[in-house]
């Protein structure tokens, strides 16, 4: 089963994507072990847990937190990852102020 995410690679704009709802697919997307940062009741940013110690390049700021390496936003329902609860357009307008 796949989930819909909002994905941002370093130096690239945000884009909509789908990934398999598996740990392996999530790790491949961020390039290592995953760590989550809750940004809403039903959404998290997923990043590389070792990004800072590995010296990954700066990516962007989301909700006042700076992220390094490739990241994605997914929805959550309880302990499960689900489709991201916002569209790319809404994300850019209201959450990150124009896609930075």
What is each model feature region?
Residues 1-100:
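Domain-length accessory/inserted modules outside core catalytic folds
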């Amino acid at each position: 089963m796949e989930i819909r995410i909002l994905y941002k690679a370093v130096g690239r704009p945000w884009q909509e994507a789908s990934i398999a709802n598996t740990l392996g697919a999530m790790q491949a997307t961020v390039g290592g072990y995953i760590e989550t940062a809750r940004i809403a009741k039903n959404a998290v940013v997923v990043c590389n847990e070792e990004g800072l110690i590995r010296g990954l390049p700066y990516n962007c700021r989301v909700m006042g937190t700076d992220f390094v390496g490739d990241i994605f936003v997914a929805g959550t329902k309880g302990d499960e990852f689900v489709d991201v609860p916002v569209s790319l357009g809404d994300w850019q307008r209201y959450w990150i102020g124009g896609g930075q």
